[in-house]
């Protein structure tokens, strides 16, 4: 396997793990505070890609986009 393919696999694994952590955190935050969601969480839950870019911090943006691009969560 060439180096580029290995790097692509590593990037996909890291992206998936980050999206999973973000999704888990959003679920726990939604359960804990249903009325005071921040704009980044609202963007993810409403499948709003532009909202992810506008309202999420750099560390939360990949997780938000991962949820928006997931066809099971945002058809």
Swiss-Prot record:
Principal subcellular localisation of the protein: secreted
Cysteine disulfide links: 40-56, 47-74, 52-64
Localisation per UniProt entry: Secreted
Propeptide residue span(s): 20-37
GO MF annotation terms: pheromone activity
Cleavable signal peptide: 1-19
Keywords for this protein: Disulfide bond, Pheromone, Secreted, Signal
Pfam hit, one: E_raikovi_mat
Gene Ontology terms: cellular component: extracellular region
UniProt keyword Signal, yes or no: yes
Function description: Mating ciliate pheromones (or gamones) are diffusible extracellular communication signals that distinguish different intraspecific classes of cells commonly referred to as 'mating types'. They prepare the latter for conjugation by changing their cell surface properties.
Subunit structure: Homodimer.
Protein name: Mating pheromone Er-10
Species whose genome carries this gene: Euplotes raikovi
């Amino acid at each position: 396997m060439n180096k580029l393919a290995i790097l692509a696999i590593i990037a996909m694994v890291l992206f998936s793990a980050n999206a999973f952590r973000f999704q888990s955190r959003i679920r726990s935050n939604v359960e804990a505070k249903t009325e005071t969601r921040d704009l980044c969480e609202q963007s993810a839950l409403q499948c709003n890609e532009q909202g992810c870019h506008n309202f999420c911090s750099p560390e939360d943006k990949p997780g938000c986009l991962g949820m928006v691009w997931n066809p099971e969560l945002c058809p």
